[in-house]
Amino acid sequence: MRNKKIFIALFILASTLTFGQAKTAEIGFITDNDLYTSSKNDMYYTNGLELFYRFLSKNNNEKINKKITEFRIGQYIYNPRFINAEAVTINDRPFTGYLFAEAGRSFFYQSESVLKTDFQLGFMGPNALGKETQESFHHIIGYKEVFGWENQLHNAFAVQAHVMYSKKMFPSKYNDFIDLHFQSEANLGTIFTGVSTGFLTRIGFKKLLPIYDSNLHDASVSFQPQYNIREFYFYAMPSVNYQFYDATIQGSMFSNTSPLTFDLEPLRFNAEFGLKYRHNNFNMSYSFIYRGRELRDPETNTNSGYFYGSIRFGYLLK
């Protein structure tokens, strides 16, 4: 009996030490697909996959709670609404893929403001392997065959910069279960150039963590030991986007040899909402994302707003 009590005590102590250790890094993935919202949906931004690794960086600024460095690799795939053999000549968006590597740094302030910056290098076009990835994925899951990749956009080299700033609204009126943030971001590069602005709210099923400890903007890593951390909330983020340039629609800015391109619909309304959860070392989320109409297609006039789902999973490391 005594040995049993000792074993239980040691198990509890080991569990406490394991979950109470500082977690200074996180590894994980993000997968996007329109099938996560509807089995009948397979158009426009149709698939995305990102692998990430982030870690805490040295910080000597008293106004900054955390400084986080992050690396990612990812691939996005785009196709028109119709991908059957009979509709190869009916296109309301180009086929293309985008493959990239990314390095970024995030600054989480004591005021719960956030500044994120990142840079990408990569390729759009055949070098991005969108055709091979989509055809293999459809074959594996037994989904319909895709026709039309012979019309995909030609190669373009990607150099991208991105910045996002978020500011907590009404910081003096603290509430354990709801908050509101103003958020703006900008992209500049050879593939995407545009700006977005909007509002984001969290509604907690449990007491909300401060933004600099929350997984909302990927700040779960910490130098401080954390004990039995739980986070579970709904979030919503409506925004307005003005897109100046999009190579996945217009083709490369350095050539006009692609077989099929379109003019942009520059002003769009976008929305995102979902659930985010954390239990100790595990982060996970599901998001439903809506994108407004992105281009003008006078010949077919079928392009419209669309939606897709995003699933994220991360694991915190020592």
Task: Describe each model-derived feature in a short phrase.
Residues 51-80, 123, 280-284:
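Glycine- and aromatic-enriched membrane insertion/assembly motifs of diderm outer-membrane
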Residues 1-25, 313-317:
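Bacterial Sec-dependent N-terminal signal peptides
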Residues 47-56, 161-167, 195-205, 271-277, ...:
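Feature captures outer-membrane beta-barrel proteins of Gram-negative bacteria and organelles
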Residues 38-44, 112, 154, 184-196, ...:
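Solvent-exposed loop/turn segments connecting transmembrane beta-strands
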Residues 73-100, 106-216, 220-223, 245-263, ...:
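Outer-membrane pore/translocation modules
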Residues 37, 81-82, 206-318:
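Outer membrane beta-barrel transmembrane domains
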Residues 22-66:
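N-terminal ordered "arm"
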Residues 25-29, 69-73, 115-121, 161, ...:
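Transmembrane beta-strands of outer-membrane beta-barrel proteins
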